[in-house]
């Protein structure tokens, strides 16, 4: 179960990629703006300021996140992102740190590009850190007993969870889009006790937590602490450096054809 309060513990750090993503969208006006994977809605509110005349549509698969978004005045809907269909007036589709949970997300992006109106925008950001220690140590510990029997049905994300910027760009260019894609690594300077553990508790560990009772969960967390400290050693000043690679794809639907016409 997703916990909005835990997720928001690092709101500033998690928010920066969202703002970086939205800043590259070229739509000056929009009729409808959709936030797919809106989470607790703290960032969705910014979309209403960026496009004040637009209808803001928000979706998330977590009822807890949707409830938190509604408390912020967001008209959010609980639903599977795979079933979302754009309305005819949709001019901007944004998904920040959500589509990596959907194995077929690249196909979804292409489908959207084929039905959205020309001149609309698709902006997606996904994590690209699934081979880093913050994921690897969780998988390694979960393979040990007594945990293995509890989490054996979890499809831990490993390998090609997300594509490369070039692969996404190629698919969307083939669909007629003009594409901007990049993959920076953010160096988060975290503070507090066991900050990397607390970070992944709000995201990557959510499906693991659902399999454990309270005692097993606390035991698992305690065993993770030294493993994460080895991978991300705290500095003497109390900060912990946490590198985090992310992939960004911003596509203007029909933009490739328009660019060719201009040239």
Swiss-Prot record:
One of its GO terms (molecular function) is trans-aconitate 2-methyltransferase activity. InterPro entries: Methyltransf_25, SAM-dependent_MTases_sf, Trans-aconitate_MeTrfase, Trans_acon_MeTrfase_C. Its EC number is 2.1.1.144. Coiled coil: none annotated. GO terms for cellular component: cytoplasm. It is an enzyme of class 2 (transferase). It comes from the Bacteria. It is found in: Cytoplasm. One of its GO terms (biological process) is methylation. The keyword Oxidoreductase does not apply. The keyword Cytoplasm applies. Keywords: Cytoplasm, Methyltransferase, S-adenosyl-L-methionine, Transferase. It catalyses: trans-aconitate + S-adenosyl-L-methionine = (E)-3-(methoxycarbonyl)pent-2-enedioate + S-adenosyl-L-homocysteine. Catalyzes the S-adenosylmethionine monomethyl esterification of trans-aconitate. HAMAP family: Tran_acon_Me_trans. Belongs to the methyltransferase superfamily. Tam family. NCBIfam families: PRK14103.1 (NF010703). This is Trans-aconitate 2-methyltransferase. The lineage of its organism: Bacteria, Bacillati, Actinomycetota, Actinomycetes, Mycobacteriales.
């Amino acid at each position: 179960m997703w916990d909005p309060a835990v997720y928001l513990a690092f709101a500033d750090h998690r928010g920066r990629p969202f703002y970086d993503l939205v800043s590259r969208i070229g739509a000056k006006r929009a009729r409808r703006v959709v936030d797919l994977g809106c989470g607790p809605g703290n960032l969705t509110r910014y979309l209403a300021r960026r496009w004040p005349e637009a209808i803001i549509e928000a979706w998330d698969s977590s009822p807890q996140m949707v409830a938190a978004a509604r408390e912020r005045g967001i008209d959010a809907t609980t639903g599977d992102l795979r079933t979302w269909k754009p309305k005819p007036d949709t001019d901007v589709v944004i998904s920040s740190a959500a589509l990596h949970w959907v194995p077929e997300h690249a196909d979804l992006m292409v489908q959207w590009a084929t039905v959205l109106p020309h001149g609309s925008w698709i902006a997606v950001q996904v994590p690209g850190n699934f081979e880093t220690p913050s994921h690897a140590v969780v998988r390694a510990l979960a393979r040990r007993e007594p945990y293995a029997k509890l989490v054996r049905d979890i499809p831990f994300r490993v390998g090609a969870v997300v594509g490369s910027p070039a692969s996404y760009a190629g698919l969307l260019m083939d669909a007629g889009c003009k594409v901007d894609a990049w993959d920076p690594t953010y160096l988060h300077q975290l503070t507090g006790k066991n900050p990397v553990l607390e970070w992944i508790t709000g995201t990557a560990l959510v499906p693991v937590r659902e399999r454990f009772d309270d005692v097993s969960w606390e035991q698992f967390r305690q065993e993770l602490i030294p493993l994460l400290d080895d991978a991300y050693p705290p500095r003497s000043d109390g900060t912990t450096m946490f590198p985090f690679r992310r992939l960004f794809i911003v596509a203007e639907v029909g933009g490739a054809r328009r660019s060719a016409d201009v040239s």
